């Protein structure tokens, strides 16, 4: 255990010379927590704001998971072609836009525009948002790993991915705390 902590400390100290890696790890820590917040609170939002049943929420989850599978595969091809940075940036932009849409929507209005009583527009929009969250969330996660690979070499990949995993957990409390 002690030697593992020594190795961890040496790796952390070695990051002083890798400013790009440090910036990436810090930004990844926050956007990964944001993505986890989106995943966690999608069902809560659907139940409390849109008054969805458990079956509708389950269907939403399945649709988002299927979108994640297909889009992650397509995103991998895109990542291979253009590299992870533009893939990560576009994914964050799309997911931010989805958050704006979700915040501007309720059962009775869309960005302040009243909807007819019983309108299915909020449901359809939220399903579309679920596809985008699942799809671009999957793309974001896979491109983030590709980016981490580019910040490592064969001699330090285990240590760097360990820090990557640790930092992903370090702020896991933020999204629930900020939303609550």
Feature-to-residue mapping (PLM):
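Loop-to-transmembrane helix entry/capping segments in MFS-fold secondary transporters
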Residues: 54-55, 154-164
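Hydrophobic core of transmembrane alpha-helices in multi-pass small-molecule transporters
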Residues: 114-139
């Amino acid at each position: 255990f002690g030697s593992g902590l020594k190795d961890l400390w040496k790796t952390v100290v070695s990051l002083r010379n890798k400013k790009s890696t440090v910036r990436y790890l810090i930004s990844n820590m926050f956007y990964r927590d944001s993505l986890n917040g989106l995943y966690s609170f999608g069902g809560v939002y659907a139940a409390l704001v849109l008054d969805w049943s458990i079956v509708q929420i389950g269907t939403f989850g399945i649709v988002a998971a299927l979108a994640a599978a297909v889009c992650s595969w397509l995103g991998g091809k895109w990542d291979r072609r253009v590299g992870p940075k533009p893939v990560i940036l576009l994914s964050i932009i799309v997911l931010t836009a989805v958050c704006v849409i979700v915040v501007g929507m309720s059962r009775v209005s869309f960005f302040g525009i009243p909807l007819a009583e019983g309108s299915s527009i909020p449901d359809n929009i939220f399903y579309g948002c679920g596809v985008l969250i699942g799809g671009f969330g999957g793309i974001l996660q896979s491109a983030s790993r590709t980016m981490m690979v580019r910040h490592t070499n064969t001699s330090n990949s285990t240590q760097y991915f360990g820090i990557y995993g640790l930092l992903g957990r370090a702020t896991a409390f933020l999204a629930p705390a900020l939303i609550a």
